[in-house]
């Protein structure tokens, strides 16, 4: 059996002006999971974020959306993980992924940061440990690296947003499978999904 996941983090920038930007795609998953489980995320200053707690398949799962800026996300994750004695390999971080198209989401265990500042800070604050799970929500790529900053901080057009929402919803459903049956079964489900 794979290591149980005890903390799901949705990476985001704080404030209403960023709420619907592509860079906040990870947070949408946590918000949707909280909604499905009828839990209100509460601001918790000592964890530098919005937190909640749900039960998935009989397992306790803490939710966190850091309210730091993206490049300081690790501070919130490390604070909560330390307090509840959650190991890096019991953490899943949901984030926007330039290398996947909108409508696609994938689970992954371990790996580098791929230039994502939220992941970079998380790895650093977890003592350079890269063993946490990732939930990659595809947002597509603007085509040129110079356009990336504007792209991730921009809002998706309506049709594209539908694809992003559908992938986030499917990721939430697949998370149940991951917690119950492990990573490979969850990957089989999520990785065959593509919103059209």
Curated annotation (Swiss-Prot):
Site residues (Discriminates between blocked and unblocked aminoacyl-tRNA), renumbered to this chain: 13
Active site: 23
Top EC class of this enzyme: hydrolase
CDD domains membership: PTH
Record field: transmembrane: none
Cellular localisation: Cytoplasm
Catalyzed reactions per annotation: an N-acyl-L-alpha-aminoacyl-tRNA + H2O = an N-acyl-L-amino acid + a tRNA + H(+)
Record-marked site positions (Stabilizes the basic form of H active site to accept a proton): 96
Pfam families xrefs: Pept_tRNA_hydro (PF01195)
EC number: 3.1.1.29
Source species, domain of life: Bacteria
Primary subcellular site in the record, as a coarse category: cytoplasm
RNA-binding listed as a keyword: yes
Record bears the keyword Transmembrane helix: no
Family annotation (InterPro entries): Pept_tRNA_hydro, Pept_tRNA_hydro_CS, Pept_tRNA_hydro_sf
Residues engaged in binding tRNA: 18, 69, 71, 117
UniProt entry keywords in alphabetical sequence: Cytoplasm, Hydrolase, RNA-binding, tRNA-binding
GO biological process, one term: rescue of stalled ribosome
GO MF: peptidyl-tRNA hydrolase activity; tRNA binding
GO CC annotations, alphabetized: cytoplasm
Family that this chain belongs to: Belongs to the PTH family.
HAMAP family, sorted: Pept_tRNA_hydro_bact
Stated role: Hydrolyzes ribosome-free peptidyl-tRNAs (with 1 or more amino acids incorporated), which drop off the ribosome during protein synthesis, or as a result of ribosome stalling.
Subunit structure: Monomer.
Protein name in UniProt: Peptidyl-tRNA hydrolase
Source organism (scientific name): Vibrio parahaemolyticus serotype O3:K6 (strain RIMD 2210633)
Gene assigned in the entry: pth
